[in-house]
């Protein structure tokens, strides 16, 4: 059963919530700066050559490391979402209210935009690369690819961070989340770009002015995140029986 809670505006503007929004903004900014920056660096070093296997690995590793750090520095304040798809997936499982989640989205998208503006400034006007499906592939293939890889990401978030039975797994959650993002970029990068994150794609689209395929990177990740939240948050966690408070023995 879906456990979505709307919440209240008052709760969403509490001091703790405002701190969470700022945390999401900063962490997303740092993540996108490093992630998009790695793609810019590759283009600079190769004179805008096409992405080769070594470049793909470098970009994947940069995103994995940056997300590991971003989740780690925000986890104790906001939960370390850094991603509207993660926020939606957690909302479907009742881990965050819709209103608060909406403000998370705003903070994440603003962080991404500011990161890309900073990159343009510090690189003296270099063009920010945007996500797009590879030549020969259609939008539907791109959406399905993003659904699958984002499902894997949000499912990992649930298993290592949101599941009340996670135990010691919680200590490796940022590492596992970074690893799955890096692995998914290696798998999906040559085809859809492997975004898994509407905010990660939105910032470059805004700064470059190229919105031609941005809908793919909202629809795919949001559907994938919601499905992961529905399956893990509502089917698995929702089926947990409460632990008994007393035990009786013969």
Curated annotation (Swiss-Prot):
The modification N6,N6-dimethyllysine is found at residue 3. Pfam families: MIP. Aquaporins contain two tandem repeats each containing three membrane-spanning domains and a pore-forming loop with the signature motif Asn-Pro-Ala (NPA). This is Probable aquaporin TIP2-2. Keywords: Acetylation, Membrane, Methylation, Phosphoprotein, Repeat, Transmembrane, Transmembrane helix, Transport, Vacuole. The gene is TIP2-2. The modification N-acetylmethionine is found at residue 1. GO terms for cellular component: central vacuole; plant-type vacuole; plant-type vacuole membrane. It is found in: Vacuole membrane. Residues 46-53, 123-133, 190-210 are vacuolar. A motif (NPA 2) lies at residues 197-199.
């Amino acid at each position: 059963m879906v456990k979505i809670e709307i919440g209240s505006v008052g709760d969403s503007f509490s001091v703790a919530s405002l701190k969470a929004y700022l945390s999401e903004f900063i962490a997303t900014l740092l993540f996108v700066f490093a992630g998009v920056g790695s793609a810019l660096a590759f283009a600079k070093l190769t004179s805008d050559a096409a992405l080769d296997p070594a470049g793909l690995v470098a970009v994947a590793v940069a995103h994995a490391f940056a997300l590991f750090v971003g989740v780690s520095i925000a986890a104790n304040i906001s939960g370390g979402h850094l991603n509207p798809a993660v926020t939606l997936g957690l909302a479907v499982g009742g881990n965050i209210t819709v209103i608060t989640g909406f403000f998370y989205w705003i903070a994440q998208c603003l962080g991404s935009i500011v990161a890309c503006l900073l990159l343009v400034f510090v690189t003296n006007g270099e063009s920010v690369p945007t996500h797009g499906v590879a030549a020969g592939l259609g939008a539907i293939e791109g959406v399905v690819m993003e659904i699958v890889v984002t499902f894997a990401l949000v499912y990992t978030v649930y298993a290592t961070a949101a599941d009340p039975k996670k135990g010691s797994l919680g200590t490796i959650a940022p590492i596992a989340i970074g690893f799955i993002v890096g692995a998914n970029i290696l798998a999906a990068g040559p085809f859809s770009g492997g975004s898994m994150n509407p905010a990660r794609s939105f910032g470059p689209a805004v700064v470059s002015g190229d919105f031609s395929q941005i809908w793919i990177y909202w629809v795919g990740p949001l559907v994938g995140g919601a499905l992961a939240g529905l399956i893990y948050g509502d089917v698995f966690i929702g089926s947990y029986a409460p632990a008994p408070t007393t035990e009786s023995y013969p």
